[in-house]
Amino acid sequence: MSTTGNIAITGIPTTAGPDGSFPLRRELRDLQRNYPDHFNLLVLALKDFQALNESVQTSYYQIAGIHGLPYKPWNNVGSNSDWQSTSGFGGYCTHSSILFLTWHRPYLALFEQALYNSIQKIANQFPQGPLRTKYVEAAKTFRMPYFDWASQPPSGSSAFPSAFTAPSLQVVDVDGKTKSTANPIYRFVFHPVNPSPGDFPRQWSRFPTTVRYPNPRTGQSQDNRVAPILANELASLRTNVSLLLLSYTNFDAFSFNRWDPNMTPGEFGSLEDVHNEIHDRTGGGGHMSSLDVSSFDPLFWFHHTNVDRLWAIWQDLNPDNFLTPRPAPYSTFNSTEGESQTKDTPLTPFWDKSATKFWTSEEIKDTTTTFGYAYPETQEWKYRTGSEYQTSIRQAVTTLYGTNVFANFAAANVQARATEHTELIKSLSLAAPPPSAPITAEKPLLITQEMKASPIPEHLQHLAPNNKYPEWVVNIRAQKHGLHGAFRVIVFLGPIDESDPDSWQTEFNTVGRVSVLGRSTQGPTTTKCAKCITDAADELMISGTVPLTSALLQDIVNENTASIACSQRKWCRI
C-alpha cells in the first residue's frame, strides 16, 4: 500500500523531563478550576478545531467520522472484499471485541494531536509580550482532559460538569480581551450536517448540532436531564469501577463485554460495560446514545479519555496480564473472520510514527507515554520501586472510588444525616416502552470482599464477620443487537409503578442497569457497520453487572428488609 499522504499518529511529541516526567491529562473540573490558562486554551482551540472545513482529513468532522458514520475510509485505509457490508464500506468498529480498549488509545492520540495543532496556533496568536509567553508556556503542557464520571464531584459541583451544559463561556480571547464565546464543549455544530449527500440518514441529519436527551417534539437538546441521572447512579458507578480496578485480574474479562460461555461468575462486568452506561445515561436518545454518531458529541472525547485512564490504572496494577489471542469474530481490513486476533493485530486506520505500518496493541499497552502523556495516578517516575508505585495507585483508587461498600455506605449516611437527606444515590434509566428480546438475568453473584480500611459502624458489624462481607451483584447477559437498537436492562429492589416508565428515572427502588448499545440491522435505520451486521447475524451475546450491596444496606438500615425477599427482586428491559 502506498504511504503517500499517510498521517502518522504520534500524539503530542514529547520528551521526558529530567525526572522522567510527562505532562498530565487532568480531570476537566480540575483543569477549569486550577489551570485556567490550559482551560482557556482548550476552549479557544477546540472551537478553532471544530471550525475546520469538514472535507479536511484532520478536521473534527473527519476524525469523529472514523468511529461510525458516515462510514468512509480514512487515512488511505480502505477495505478488503471480505469486509464490505452490503451498503459499502463497513467501518473500523472494535466494540465488543478484544481490541476495544487498545483501538481507542491511538484514536484518542490522533484527536489530541489534531487539537494540539490548534492549541499551538491559538497560543501564538496572543499579542507579543507576557500574555503570549504565558499561553505558549501553558501550551507545552496541555493534554486532553478527562471527565471522571465515577468519582465524587468537588464540593459545590454538579455530577455533570457545567462546561458540558453552558452554551457560552467567558474566555481571554487572542486579542487579550475577556469576552463571551460559544462553548465548543457544549456541542458540535455541523457545517453542514451532510457535507456529502447521504453522510447521515434522516434519523440524524435533522439535527444541526449534537444533542442530549432531545425533546421528542422539537428535537431540542435537554442537557439539564443529564446531571440528576448521573448523580443518582454515582454509588453504583463507584462500586463498579472499584470492583473492576481492584478485583479483576484478567484483561479479557476487564476490558470488553462480549459474553463467553467459559466466563466465571465474577467476570460478567467490564470497562466496556461501564463505558456503555455513560454513553446511554448522557445521551438519552441523542448522539451519545448511538455508537454510529457518538464521537461527534464533544463529551465523547472527555468520556473516552477517562476510559483510557481507567485502563492505564488497571494495566499498571496488572502489568503481566494482557489480551489472549482468539479467533477474529468478524472480518476487518487486515484480518478475515476466524483468523487469530492478537496483540499484534493492526489497529486500523492508525498509522504508527513511521507512517508505514499500523499501531498494534502490543506497542501501546505498557505506557501512555508512548503518546506523550500520563495521568495523575500513573506518575511512575515518582517512585523508587514498582511495589511503591502500585501501592500509590491502590491508594488513589480507594480515595476516589472507595475502599469497600460498607465504608462508602457509612460515609454516605453520615453526610446524608447532616443534610437531612437520607436517600442514597442510586442509578436510574431513560424510560421507553419495553419490547421483547432474549435476555437472561443470572443469579445474583456473591463475591467475598475483605475490607482493608475504614472501620465498620458497630450496628453493621454483624454483616461483615471477620472483616469480610458478601458483595452482591446481578449478572446479566443479552443479545446485543436483538432489539435493533440501544436498550437497557434495569434492576429494581422493591416495588415500582410499572404503569409509568417515566417515573423509573426517580424511583428509589431502582438499583441500576446494564446498557446495551445495539444497532439496527433492518429497515431504513440499518447500520452500515459491517461488524455489527455480522454480530447480529451471529446473535452476539454481551454481559454486564449491577452491584446490589449498597442498595441492600440502605434497606437494612431503613429496616426495609422486604426488598431482600425474592418476590421483590425485579428486572426489566427497555
UniProtKB/Swiss-Prot annotation:
GO biological process: melanin biosynthetic process
Gene3D superfamilies, per database record: 2.60.310.20, Di-copper center containing domain from catechol oxidase (1.10.1280.10)
EC annotation from Swiss-Prot or TrEMBL: 1.14.18.1
InterPro entries: Di-copper_centre_dom_sf (IPR008922), Monophenol_mOase_fun (IPR016216), Tyrosinase/Hemocyanin (IPR050316), Tyrosinase_C (IPR041640), Tyrosinase_Cu-bd (IPR002227)
Catalytic activities: 2 L-dopa + O2 = 2 L-dopaquinone + 2 H2O; L-tyrosine + O2 = L-dopaquinone + H2O
Membrane-spanning ranges: none
Note accompanying the cofactor annotation: Binds 2 copper ions per subunit.
GO MF assignments: metal ion binding; tyrosinase activity
Domain of life: Eukaryota
Alphabetical UniProt keywords: Copper, Melanin biosynthesis, Metal-binding, Monooxygenase, Oxidoreductase, Thioether bond
Record-stated family: Belongs to the tyrosinase family.
Function field: This is a copper-containing oxidase that functions in the formation of pigments such as melanins and other polyphenolic compounds.
Name recorded for this polypeptide: Tyrosinase
Taxonomic lineage of the native organism: Eukaryota, Fungi, Dikarya, Ascomycota, Pezizomycotina
